[in-house]
């Protein structure tokens, strides 16, 4: 029980810390919501040790627009240091997006060393700095608490079992992408709501959807979200069309409502 409450407390601390980091940069609730014309603020979500001794540092972002999707190419205006390009997104969906990517650092990474993600758009520069502060250590139970998915310690993230590989297309041709995932059937549907889960969403089962992760602007995806309950493989199919040549990364996300797994597909458009 002591460990359980420690995890919950840590999750709350990480959540509050993220809010503190963002508070000076995101709109207050009293401000008028803006559909367009706003900037993006990166966010450090916390760090997690890996089985091989390395450490993953997780980042997300807050697109302050309610409707507008933004594109910021890799470079001085979308930069992670050290390294420059560490797998960060270039396409930004509206509002708060958590745990979007991680940066793996070696096991001897110093406590005072930082991973810094800088985003600049519309003349505004925002920065997220991640380092190994003990209070910012997270695990899957903390992630479930942050996403409102309860605290099922036995839950495991979905697993992709098949899907499209890298593709090449010539304009104006489209590409069709598929991804199939399966899950352990947790969290299970609740017949009687647990006291600690009151206010959280009901488990929705496994779903798979496609998003634009990287590439030039002008990508259109046909609807690609499928949900089919518990412990069944789910296949999502989407058709992507492009306006510009370039290298794109399209991401399939499998979620059980609490934990997620992603699969990236690179599409080269000529």
Question: What function would you assign to each model-found segment?
Answer:
Residues 98-104:
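Ligand-binding face of N-terminal immunoglobulin V-set domains in extracellular IgSF glycoproteins
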Residues 28, 37-44, 48-50, 61-63, ...:
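Extracellular/lumenal mature domains of secreted and surface-exposed proteins
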Residues 25-32:
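Cleaved targeting-peptide boundary
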Residues 14-23:
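C-terminal segment of classical bacterial N-terminal signal peptides
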Residues 55-61:
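Short, well-ordered beta-strand segments enriched in hydrophobic/aromatic residues
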Residues 105-148:
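Ser/Thr/Pro-rich, low-complexity mucin-like regions
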Residues 6-13:
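Sec-dependent N-terminal signal peptides
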Residues 1-4:
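Positively charged n-region of N-terminal signal peptides that target proteins for export
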């Amino acid at each position: 029980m002591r460990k359980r409450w420690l995890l919950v407390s840590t999750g709350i601390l990480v959540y509050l810390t993220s809010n503190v980091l963002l508070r000076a940069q995101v709109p207050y609730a009293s401000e008028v919501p803006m559909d367009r014309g706003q900037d993006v603020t990166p966010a450090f979500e916390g760090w997690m040790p890996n089985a091989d001794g390395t450490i993953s540092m997780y980042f997300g972002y807050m697109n302050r627009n309610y409707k507008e999707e933004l594109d910021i190419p890799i470079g001085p205006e979308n930069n992670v240091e050290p390294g420059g390009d560490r797998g960060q997104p270039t396409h930004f969906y509206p509002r708060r997006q958590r745990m979007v990517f991680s940066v793996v650092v070696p096991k001897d990474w110093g406590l005072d060393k930082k991973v810094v993600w800088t985003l600049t758009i519309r003349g505004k520069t925002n920065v997220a700095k991640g380092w190994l502060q003990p209070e910012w250590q997270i695990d899957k139970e903390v992630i479930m608490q942050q996403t409102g998915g309860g605290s099922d310690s036995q839950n495991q993230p979905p697993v992709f079992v098949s899907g499209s590989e890298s593709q090449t297309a010539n304009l104006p041709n489209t590409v069709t992408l598929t991804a199939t995932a399966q899950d352990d059937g947790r969290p299970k549907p609740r017949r009687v709501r647990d006291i600690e889960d009151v206010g959280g969403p009901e488990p929705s089962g496994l779903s798979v959807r496609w998003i634009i992760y990287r590439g030039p602007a002008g990508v259109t995806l046909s609807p690609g979200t499928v949900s089919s309950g518990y412990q069944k493989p789910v296949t999502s199919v989407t058709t992507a069309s492009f306006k510009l040549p370039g290298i794109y990364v399209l991401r399939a996300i499998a979620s059980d409502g609490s934990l997620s797994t992603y699969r990236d597909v690179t599409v080269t458009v000529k």
